[in-house]
């Protein structure tokens, strides 16, 4: 029986996940930029974040986040609200359109994966299902 090189397997898994994530991001954008899509998801994960909070979360410079946020507000995806306690701070909320866009992004990602899975043989579809179960277990253990 051949001995598995776990280091090489881990590196291959990391590369495959990175490539899959990149493909999912590009397949799901619709009419918004990757930075806008990422910011929408960051806003959704946080309660009433400030632009500074988003700059940290997105690992971006504050002026870049401000510029993207202004574009997103103009598109109706978010609402910029002055902080009542600190007038220097601006808080960010998702608009109804922003929530719809997040749902559309997720739907497009799922459709992309579903299309890929449907192109596989039945045997490979079962292997993919087993792989998902494995990844879920792996993440639960972390």
Regions found by a protein language model. Give the residues of each.
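A structural signal for well-ordered alpha-helices, especially hydrophobic packing surfaces
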Residues: 17, 21, 102, 136-139
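Charged, amphipathic alpha-helical coiled-coil/dimerization segments
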Residues: 70-130
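Charged, amphipathic alpha-helical oligomerization/scaffolding segments
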Residues: 12, 16-19, 97, 127, ...
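N-terminal leader segment of winged-helix/HTH proteins
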Residues: 1-31
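N-terminal helix-turn-helix DNA-binding core of bacterial DNA-binding proteins
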Residues: 22-64, 69, 75
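Exposed, interaction-prone assembly regions rather than primary DNA-binding/catalytic cores
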Residues: 126-142
């Amino acid at each position: 029986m051949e001995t598995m090189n776990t280091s090489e397997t881990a590196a291959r898994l990391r590369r495959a996940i990175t490539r899959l994530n990149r493909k999912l991001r590009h397949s799901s954008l619709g009419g918004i930029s990757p930075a806008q899509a990422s910011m929408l998801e960051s806003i959704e994960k946080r309660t009433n974040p400030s632009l500074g909070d988003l700059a940290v979360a997105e690992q971006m410079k504050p002026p870049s986040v401000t510029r993207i946020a202004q574009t997103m507000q103009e598109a109706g995806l978010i609402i910029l609200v002055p902080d009542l306690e600190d007038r220097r701070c601006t808080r960010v909320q998702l608009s109804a359109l922003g929530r719809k866009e997040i749902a559309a992004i997720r739907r497009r990602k799922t459709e992309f994966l579903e299309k890929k899975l449907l192109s596989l043989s039945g045997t490979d579809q079962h292997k993919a299902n087993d792989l998902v179960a494995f990844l879920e277990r792996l993440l639960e253990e972390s």
